[in-house]
């Protein structure tokens, strides 16, 4: 697990091959625009971010599929840490369109070819 400011698709492929084969788990702090990659569970990255000053309501889990870079299937919004009933997010997806868009914006800035 590591915090990244930028990461290449090649690095994501390497991470995916060592853990899940076709995906890399990622946590995003939408307020601080912090990105944590390469953990076994989203909860691991969530714990790290909370220990380092992030707020629970700002943390969202996604999966990146390096083989699908450049397509709509690159980012998968599916994580247990996304279940936030008090924020109206009753799904493993990210239902708030503004938060969803912010995550896409952050990922598009951080991940390079």
Language-model segments: what does each one mean?
Residues 66-94:
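Intrinsically disordered, low-complexity regulatory segments enriched in Ser/Thr/Pro
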Residues 1-8, 80-84:
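Conserved, charge-rich beta-strand/loop surface module that forms ligand/interface-binding patches
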Residues 40-74:
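Amphipathic, interaction-prone secondary-structure segments
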Residues 5-48:
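Negatively charged, low-complexity tracts enriched in Asp/Glu with abundant Ser/Thr
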Residues 23-30, 75-77, 103, 107:
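Generic structural hydrophobic/aromatic packing signal, biased to beta-strands
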Residues 8-16, 85-96:
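Short histidine-centered catalytic/ligand-binding loop motif
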Residues 92-113:
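Well-ordered alpha/beta subsegment
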């Amino acid at each position: 697990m590591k915090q990244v400011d930028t990461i290449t698709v090649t690095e994501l492929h390497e991470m995916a091959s060592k853990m899940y084969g076709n995906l890399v788990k990622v946590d995003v702090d939408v307020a601080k625009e912090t990105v944590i990659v390469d953990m076994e569970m989203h909860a691991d990255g969530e714990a790290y971010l909370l220990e380092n000053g992030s707020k629970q309501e700002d943390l969202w889990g996604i999966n990146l599929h390096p083989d699908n870079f450049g397509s709509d299937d690159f980012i998968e919004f599916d994580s247990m840490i996304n279940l936030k009933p008090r924020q109206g997010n009753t799904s493993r997806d990210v239902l708030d369109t503004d938060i969803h868009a912010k995550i896409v914006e952050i990922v598009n800035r951080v991940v390079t070819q």
